[in-house]
């Protein structure tokens, strides 16, 4: 049969393995880097027979994203085998590849600790050196149950029984047997660079009612340099951890015994957040948005109407008032629909752009809560645009322009992913084509590139995801632009067209920064706590050498505050070096030292948080420096900063 491999057509004999088919098509050096393949898009082991209907075979290389994922998944199996050898009686559960590595959950008589990792790694090295092949066996569910019952693996038995299919696949490597869909790398020697990172507790199946397991995290790469770079990134991420910096900078705290997953904003953190919120409101007003706000509690019936009750209620909080059931809002869209519906709209009234810094609550399991990055109460910079179909592309262009300006303001590089129609969806082909083409056209008009994520749109419409890269190369998803065919129909939203008839508007959900809590967490780590001068809670701090300069320092503070700047004066009876060090740890941009010479000259000695000394400056010069520093990032996006 004729099969296309890397753009060339080859005659592949029936019954041959994927390995042999690729070996005949690729150079020796290239073939050695292949870890699996895709036949007509289906991932397969290299030992698998090429299916009879195959027209295309795509090699999966070790250093590709898919190849690295396979290496990590196989490394999880290797780790589980090592743990079983070192700790007799341990029970294995699940061990997937994840974004930056892999993990495996174990049930043992005691929790694993970081002290165990070195021994596990050493045993893994032996297994890697042995080059045990990964072999796949398919069997019935009953056979798999009997297999794992005989091994005493109760967790695997439970998983098998929950699988709806009649047959399952099992992989063997060395002495280890695991239930797995596959595919896997050819043998254990392909895991050339790995490292075990940490241990944690995890409930079986994420349910707090189940047994607590020991989760061991690790990572693996195709080559040692990539692993070294990743480990450096991990160390840098620890230094930038927003939870540590939040405490160091006195921005926020959590009290898990009182309100798990909910933030206590301290004065400086609240000031930073307020500066951000005020900026967002002003920027949206400039761009034609209207400020709105909906209630926190809505009757259950409205959540049933919107579809949230059927599809999202496990993530919602409910209460009863006067015998009526209410849901605490997990999203802002329903209220915005009702605000739109409060008036009969004309085609001349569209588009309507409604913006809300809306507080929402979502029930997240305690095991996934993580500082500001995963919380139960958060604020979204949420907007909903209702427009005519002919206005859709222009509205998306406007949203992309806002994304571009805000990401540029904060110094984030980003990429755009467009997700298209999934198998299960609502709406006509015409609606989907028009919406998808509007997204693609808007991105093209903005002069930006994009990738397509086929079939990953929501059931109610296609979407754009904006993925930003931070200062140490980590990727975060922040912005989402989503076309929705469902809610306007469910809430019977209409406008009167030019023909005098009722028409259904198109709806766009969009959030630019997403959760403000999460964004501030990302921002803290991106800047390692050294926030840009325009948003930092304290822009400058005056430090006195002795009490003799206190009056001058307080007067200077008042003068700078009157100029619209955020300035403190530290007049404590402490050594100057101590006060300077404290200001540097708090990452205050401008440290203004006041001694007798400065008082006599009527100025201050200016030091930057990076240690650079700018010498004696007048207060007017200091104010101008801070103003220019604030304006600089705004100039990049053609925006301006207000000191009011």
Curated annotation (Swiss-Prot):
Cofactor: Zn(2+)
Catalytic function, reaction form: tRNA(Thr) + L-threonine + ATP = L-threonyl-tRNA(Thr) + AMP + diphosphate + H(+)
GO molecular function, one term: threonine-tRNA ligase activity
Location of region: Catalytic: 241-532
Gene3D superfamilies (UniProt xref): 3.30.54.20, Anticodon-binding domain, Bira Bifunctional Protein, Domain 2, Threonyl-trna Synthetase, Chain A, domain 2
One GO cellular component, as annotated: cytosol
Family annotation (SMART domains): tRNA_SAD
BP terms from Gene Ontology: threonyl-tRNA aminoacylation
Keyword vocabulary terms for this entry: Aminoacyl-tRNA synthetase, ATP-binding, Cytoplasm, Ligase, Metal-binding, Nucleotide-binding, Protein biosynthesis, RNA-binding, tRNA-binding, Zinc
Amino-acid positions noted as binding Zn(2+) in the UniProt annotation, renumbered to this chain: 333, 384, 509
EC number: 6.1.1.3
Compartment(s) of residence: Cytoplasm
Predominant cellular place of this UniProt entry's protein: cytoplasm
InterPro entries reported for this sequence: aa-tRNA-synt_IIb, aa-tRNA-synth_II, aa-tRNA-synth_II/BPL/LPL, Anticodon-bd, Anticodon-bd_dom_sf, TGS, Thr-tRNA-ligase_IIa, Thr/Ala-tRNA-synth_IIc_edit
UniProt keyword Signal, yes or no: no
Cofactor note: Binds 1 zinc ion per subunit.
Pfam families: HGTP_anticodon, tRNA-synt_2b, tRNA_SAD
CDD domains cross-referenced by the UniProt entry: ThrRS_anticodon (cd00860), ThrRS_core (cd00771)
Protein family according to the UniProt entry: Belongs to the class-II aminoacyl-tRNA synthetase family.
Role summary: Catalyzes the attachment of threonine to tRNA(Thr) in a two-step reaction: L-threonine is first activated by ATP to form Thr-AMP and then transferred to the acceptor end of tRNA(Thr). Also edits incorrectly charged L-seryl-tRNA(Thr).
NCBIfam families, A to Z: thrS (TIGR00418)
Record text on subunit structure and interactions: Homodimer.
Protein name: Threonine--tRNA ligase
Species for this entry: Nitratidesulfovibrio vulgaris (strain DSM 19637 / Miyazaki F)
């Amino acid at each position: 049969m004729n099969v296309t491999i890397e753009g060339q057509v080859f005659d592949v004999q029936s019954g041959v393995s994927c390995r042999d088919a690729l070996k005949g098509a690729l150079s020796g050096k290239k073939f050695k880097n292949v870890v699996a393949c895709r036949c007509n898009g289906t991932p397969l082991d290299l030992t698998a027979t090429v299916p009879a209907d195959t027209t295309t075979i795509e090699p999966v290389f070790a250093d590709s994203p898919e190849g690295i994922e396979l290496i990590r998944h196989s490394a999880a199996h290797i780790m589980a085998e090592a743990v079983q050898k070192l700790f007799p009686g341990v029970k294995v559960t699940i061990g997937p590849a994840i974004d930056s590595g892999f993990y495996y959950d174990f049930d043992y008589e005691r929790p694993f600790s970081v002290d165990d990792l070195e021994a596990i790694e050493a045993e893994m090295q032996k297994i890697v050196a042995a080059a045990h092949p990964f072999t796949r066996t398919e069997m019935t569910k009953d056979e798999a149950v009997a297999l794992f019952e005989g091994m005493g693996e109760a967790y695997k038995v439970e998983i098998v029984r929950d699988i709806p299919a009649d047959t399952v696949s099992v992989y063997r490597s060395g002495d280890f047997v695991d239930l797995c869909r596959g595919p896997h790398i050819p043998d254990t020697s392909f895991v050339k660079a790995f490292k075990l990172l940490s241990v944690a507790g995890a409930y079986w199946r994420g349910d707090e009612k189940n047994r607590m397991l020991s989760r061991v995290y690790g990572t693996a790469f195709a080559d040692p340099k990539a692993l070294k770079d990743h480990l450096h990134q991990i160390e840098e991420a620890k230094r930038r951890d927003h939870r540590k910096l939040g405490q160091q900078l006195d921005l926020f705290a959590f009290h898990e015994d009182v309100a798990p997953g909910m933030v206590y904003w301290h004065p400086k953190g609240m000031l930073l957040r307020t500066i951000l919120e005020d900026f967002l409101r002003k920027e949206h007003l400039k761009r034609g948005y209207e400020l709105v706000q909906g209630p926190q509690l809505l009757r259950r019936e409205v959540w049933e109407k919107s579809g949230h009750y059927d599809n999202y209620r496990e993530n919602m909080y409910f209460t009863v008032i006067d015998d009526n059931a209410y849901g605490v809002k997990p999203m802002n869209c329903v209220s915005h629909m009702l605000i739109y519906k409060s008036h009969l709209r004309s085609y001349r009234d569209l588009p309507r752009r409604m913006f809300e810094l809306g507080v929402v609550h979502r029930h997240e399991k305690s095991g996934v809560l993580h500082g500001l990055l995963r919380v139960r109460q958060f604020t979204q910079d949420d907007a909903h645009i209702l427009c005519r179909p002919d206005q859709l592309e222009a509205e998306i262009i406007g949203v992309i322009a806002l994304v571009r300006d805000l990401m540029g303001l904060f110094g984030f590089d980003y990429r755009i992913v467009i997700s298209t129609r999934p198998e299960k969806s609502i709406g006509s082909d015409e609606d989907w084509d028009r919406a998808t083409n509007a997204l693609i056209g808007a991105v093209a008009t903005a002069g930006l590139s994009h990738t397509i994520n086929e079939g990953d749109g929501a059931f109610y419409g296609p979407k754009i995801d904006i993925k930003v890269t931070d200062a140490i190369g980590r990727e975060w998803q922040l912005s989402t632009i989503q076309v929705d065919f469902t809610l306007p129909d469910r809430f019977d939203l209409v406008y009167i067209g030019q023909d005098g008839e009722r028409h259904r508007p198109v709806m766009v959900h969009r959030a630019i920064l997403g959760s403000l809590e999460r964004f501030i967490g990302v921002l803290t780590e991106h800047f390692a706590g050294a926030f840009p001068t325009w948003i930092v809670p304290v822009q400058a701090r005056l430090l006195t050498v002795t009490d003799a300069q206190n009056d001058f320092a307080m007067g200077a503070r008042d003068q700078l505050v009157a100029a619209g700047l955020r300035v403190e004066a530290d007049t404590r009876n402490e050594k100057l070096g101590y006060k300077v060090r404290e200001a540097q740890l708090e990452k205050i941009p401008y440290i203004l030292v006041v001694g007798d010479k400065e008082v006599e000259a009527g100025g201050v000695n200016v030091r930057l948080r990076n240690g650079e000394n700018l010498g004696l400056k007048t207060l007017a010069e200091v104010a101008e420096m801070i103003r220019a520093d604030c304006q600089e990032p705004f100039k990049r996006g053609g925006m301006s900063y207000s000191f009011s």
